[in-house]
Amino acid sequence: MAESAGASSFFPLVVLLLAGSGGSGPRGIQALLCACTSCLQTNYTCETDGACMVSIFNLDGMEHHVRTCIPKVELVPAGKPFYCLSSEDLRNTHCCYIDFCNKIDLRVPSGHLKEPEHPSMWGPVELVGIIAGPVFLLFLIIIIVFLVINYHQRVYHNRQRLDMEDPSCEMCLSKDKTLQDLVYDLSTSGSGSGLPLFVQRTVARTIVLQEIIGKGRFGEVWRGRWRGGDVAVKIFSSREERSWFREAEIYQTVMLRHENILGFIAADNKDNGTWTQLWLVSDYHEHGSLFDYLNRYTVTIEGMIKLALSAASGLAHLHMEIVGTQGKPGIAHRDLKSKNILVKKNGMCAIADLGLAVRHDAVTDTIDIAPNQRVGTKRYMAPEVLDETINMKHFDSFKCADIYALGLVYWEIARRCNSGGVHEEYQLPYYDLVPSDPSIEEMRKVVCDQKLRPNVPNWWQSYEALRVMGKMMRECWYANGAARLTALRIKKTLSQLSVQEDVKI
């Protein structure tokens, strides 16, 4: 607007200057005579070969009248000369081409430069609406937040009150009992599925977290303390609620408890009034996973047999179906690998991470595959899983896939066996054939198309234990799942080997 005003003020000045000069052109036969307001010496008359002009405009608040001559050379552009243009609010200009035709009076321009338009002021109703709207919304948000927090706190305190008032809880959790005593008493006298839910809640809410010992896609694992004993606390992120619920559900299967399956203690959704934590409490094993253990240590022949036999025992118990009123369904792990097997103080294994496991209902011959987005570990997938030929309706198919993965775990263990001072560095299966994080397509090409398996060194034939291990591995890796060994057959073979090698289990 400022630029427009400047340009509009400049034009009248040009007109005044032009008027001062008289606008005279060269005299000639066809010269045009015009009235001239500034031509005192020629009796207010000028002569031109162009046009007569009359203009009235406002400048600095004053009205100015100009009559003058416009030379022909100044009449540009042709048809609409610059000097003949008008502006409704600032100036009124007229050009003509007859002698003294500019002796006319023009309409005075309507006003000065337009002031910038200001928006109209808000009325009282609008002002009230503008102020009251956000204030009301803010109060509404505060009330909703207060009600949500109050609800969570009521639920939290009610749970605490119920736990404190439950006499059976006090009876079970007498102060002279350790965690191990409690788990043993309840698992042997009850259904074999672990602690009652109210006891689980009480235990979980009296655990003191000490240090973080692991992280995964599900969340974190902490070492905690309860009544002088260590426990492992797996804390799931809220988006992994399905995984938490499924794993807790599997662990609480009737008659599941076994010395070679991770001891489940409690599951609880801890609500502290503002957010919910999903806890899964289990036995703590300081050696960590078999993967960590083999990376740190080599093993003797005795140690290798103990690790292999205990892993087979745990898997055989998972796969086994126990018939009866206190029976147990067959369970397939579906994600067996060295990172999901823990090593106990006594050098034995405990199978863990049952979040992907499936149970078989013998009565209806159905499998309860949970709606979980997690998938198994590609490196340990059996050929029939990689090429999608596995029969998902047949429970034995899942057990056969577990056996293939167990064979790979045995290969990891045997490589670290120190026999006659000879051992190999720890490596993952297929380390020399696929990248560190292989795709399903890369694994399928190696395992299904090329039918390759991890290398079994020839020098293992020099040691009976390693020879037996190598033979078992190959029988676990058959492309045809039905031809593979069963977990029970592997357990029996390793039991015989332990007797031959005089291994005390």
Curated annotation (Swiss-Prot):
Autophosphorylated. Phosphorylated by activin receptor type-2 (ACVR2A or ACVR2B) in response to activin-binding at serine and threonine residues in the GS domain. Phosphorylation of ACVR1B by activin receptor type-2 regulates association with SMAD7. Gene3D superfamilies: CD59, Phosphorylase Kinase, domain 1, Transferase(Phosphotransferase) domain 1. Its EC number is 2.7.11.30. Residues 1-23 form the signal peptide. Urogenital ridge, testis, ovary, brain and lungs. The active site is at 335 (proton acceptor). Activin receptor type-2 (ACVR2A or ACVR2B) activates the type-1 receptor through phosphorylation of its regulatory GS domain. Residues 207-497 form the Protein kinase domain. Residues 177-206 form the GS domain. SMART domains: GS, S_TKc. ATP binds at residues 213-221, 234. Belongs to the protein kinase superfamily. TKL Ser/Thr protein kinase family. TGFB receptor subfamily. This is Activin receptor type-1B. It comes from Rattus norvegicus. The lineage of its organism: Eukaryota, Metazoa, Chordata, Craniata, Vertebrata. The gene is Acvr1b.
